[in-house]
């Protein structure tokens, strides 16, 4: 896989809608690098932006964009759709590669300094500029979770307008202060929501993206006081491997890895995990080779997980997000995110302040 990120930006307008291939796969083949679609709306004084395919293996936003662009309807406002990383999606097997093999994660480079001359940093700057230059009234970034999961939103700003955005797609969200260099962390002077549409291979995820995108582009007013519909999970922790620790997923402890999580771990994306729930196995050494980083950069793993005779158990009642069994992601990015639910959160705060 020696394909490089293209430097040129491809712009399309309404005239291209009739030329779009009938399938999403055919549409992908028509794109050659960063691709921007500008569609004029009924109200041409306002702009809304959709970014998608930052990760090449997360197709729901792309599928929804293809569906909407082909239906030839006029949006309520001007719409800019940015297809961020077609190169990764086109790399065989198609729609299976998060990023190009020799490149790093695009959604970790949006905070890179202007002097960073890596191709991927340049692509991130091009995308940021493409969003900022139209002065949008709202921005949606569409993703999929790596494992099977219901849809949820991720936001940084706890305000009604941003919650209204999320409510167009889902009624569940994470309010986070964690920073990883994502596009969501950038300042566009507009409400911004990341939508995780669900698992990348689930038809329901593509429907979430289509339904939400339709609402986002067709409504004259999207800030209509629907924020009370949204269930908020606050202060996620990012659970990662420590150092060069290894991980596997199995019904039994693996002798070839430091950490073994349950083979059915993805089910915890759909339900709370109770204190005392068995999670997996670990090496019996002195240190647990996992960390749970909070928004202040502090490791909270000892408040989340108990070890007992080489077994791992939940120490708190938690909601897990983005659990997946893809070894490359679990090893190089993170295992999952977790929010501690209210009853357990109160106990954690007592421990933190020494009560």
How should these model regions be labeled?
Residues 1-355:
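Structured catalytic-domain cores with a bias toward divalent-metal coordination
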